[in-house]
Amino acid sequence: MIDRYKHQQLRIGSVSPQQITAWANKILPNGEIVGEVTKPYTFHYKTNKPEKDGLFCERIFGPIKSGICACGNYRVIGDEKEDPKFCEQCGVEFVDSRIRRYQMGYIKLACPVTHVWYLKRLPSYIANLLDKPLKELEGLVYCDVYPNFSFARPIAKKPTFLRLRGSFEYEIQSWKYSIPLFFTTQGFDTFRNREISTGAGAIREQLADPDLRTITDHSLVEWKELGEKGSTGNEWEDRKIGRRKDFLVRRLELAKNLIRTNVEPEWMVLRLLPVLPPELRPIIQIDGGKPMSSDINELYRRVIYRNNTLTDPLTTSRSTPGESVMCQEKLVQEAVDTLLDNGIRGQPMKDGHNKVYKSFSDVIEGKEGRFRETLLGKRVDYSGRSVIVVGPSLSLHRCGLPREIAIELFQTFVIRGLIRQHVASNIGIAKSKIREKEPIVWEILQEVMQGHPVLLNRAPTLHRLGIQAFQPILVEGRAICLHPLVRKGFNADFDGDQMAVHVPLSLEAQAEACLLMFSHMNLLSPTIGDPISVPTQDMLIGLYVLTIGNRRGICANRYNPCNCRNDNDQNETVDDNNYKYTKEKEPYFCSSYDALGAYRQKRIHLDSPLWLRWRLDQRVIASREVPIEVQYESSGTHHEIYGHYLIVRSVKKEILCIYIRTTVGHISFYREIEEAIQGFCRAYSYGT
């Protein structure tokens, strides 16, 4: 059985043929090695038992029932006194049946087969490493142009019968008609296997030939040479050089990744095809006793059928035309491609009911795949899920948690709090108080949540910002409230998206959440370093409306705040708040508090222009700006009115005070930014 504490991580990558055989092979007491699947059969139609050496063989994958072999004998599992561990008649091991969930097998392919993920996916890894056009490689692998030997090479390092010292071009006219006639003669396969390698075998030889460090060195040298040339003056040539440099960068990165992960390039060409454990591709019986099988079983059967058809002429002494052999190799290649990724080469393969087969790629990829739905999407303890809505009044590091979710997630902590405060004597009474929703329950819940962060996650978690920590607060309703600035990190929208909430239990997890995962500590993109918490959509519209003001300008609505001397004017009112308000003219205020107070009392509007007394800051004054109007008073003071500010000067032309022309929206926005900066400075000084 798999030890869950031993295997703490999962890594996906290429493996060597030796590793595949190590996963699958088992040695029986009689010395026989089992693990290779050679027959395309599943269950016997009469006995309903797995066929020997088939896709569900009990010798290869383990018993269907724990401790019971194919003969029906029983042994106690784990008893060291029980001997032998294998059945001497059928060769089935006496182990737990759960071994069929992870015990693998393999198919020994009669010819090398390229892995379609590395050949057809863009960018093509094989084409990048070999520096060959993808169409040329496809023509070689799938024999689209028969016989395509433009990439064939001698197997032996020394000259052979054909005096081939390297690859030769099929396009040469002298070869064009003689090669097809020669390679369709009897005994071609024996001669071909001795002289040259073709198809996927040729690609495998090419991938195994160069050293990865040599590839990196040559690519780096060529990239530097192209960079030193500079512009040629020809736009088409410059684009060609740019594409070549981009290709060299991709090739260099690929070679470095292969070196770092200890992956050999020739592993991209398969000689052994792993067979999934039977429990991951089951055959079940539905109503009426009709069997229903996974599509992968049918695709495996197709591979085995075609592989056995190719193995027969290669292992026997019968002479087979080379064209027939290469055609059968193409069928094996296409069968393996369909198993790994159905439809990657065009039209997908369908069954008799015109239904597309689900290949291995279809099983693992997408929202309903093995990883996102079965492994990452499974329910866990101390977690909840709900729709997210905007919480504009929240701080960046806070989230609003519905009471219904919060009381379930923190129920154990609330129970402990009720017992510690002697409100409940045992767990049962504490649970009853929680069900009755007594006021003391919410008070204890508030205390528990105050120092306990929660983790919010939105699938798919494609980067580290897909899961962040927040300080929860209780909110009404059934939706999770979220600050709009953290939306981009989750790649979420407030149009019905759902997010999961998790409670970190251990002290280590809580410390990691507080120190590394809080949203206000992840303001920059981890990939490119750009700010990721930036206002978008509704926030930009709100800021625009808040700061748009009255765009008519002072010339359109001319006002002098000091020119109101008629106390009997019915349009003018003066109160004790140190501001003068005129219904027809722009009011002026001594402080921002007075302006906001007037707005709350609905005496002015959000975008109404006003004059606000400002500190004597020379940065407000433009040195070259000419006043629109200058007004003098009998006392000798005068007022210089500009487009966006007003200066009151004394007789000696000294600045007495400055008024700026603004709106309540601008004042509110400025105060919010100022408070945020001051709070950040205090937090920074406290941390240092």
Curated annotation (Swiss-Prot):
Its cofactor is Mg(2+); Zn(2+). Keywords: Chloroplast, DNA-directed RNA polymerase, Magnesium, Metal-binding, Nucleotidyltransferase, Plastid, Transcription, Transferase, Zinc. Gene3D superfamilies: 1.10.40.90, 2.40.40.20, RNA polymerase II, clamp domain, RNA polymerase Rpb1, domain 3. It catalyses: RNA(n) + a ribonucleoside 5'-triphosphate = RNA(n+1) + diphosphate. It holds the Pfam family RNA_pol_Rpb1_2. SUPFAM superfamilies: beta and beta-prime subunits of DNA dependent RNA-polymerase (SSF64484). One of its GO terms (cellular component) is chloroplast. Mg(2+) binds at residues 493, 495, 497. Its EC number is 2.7.7.6. Binds 1 Mg(2+) ion per subunit. It is an enzyme of class 2 (transferase). It is found in: Plastid, Chloroplast. Zn(2+) binds at residues 69, 71, 87, 90. Belongs to the RNA polymerase beta' chain family. RpoC1 subfamily. In plastids the minimal PEP RNA polymerase catalytic core is composed of four subunits: alpha, beta, beta', and beta''. When a (nuclear-encoded) sigma factor is associated with the core the holoenzyme is formed, which can initiate transcription. This is DNA-directed RNA polymerase subunit beta'. It comes from Chloranthus spicatus.
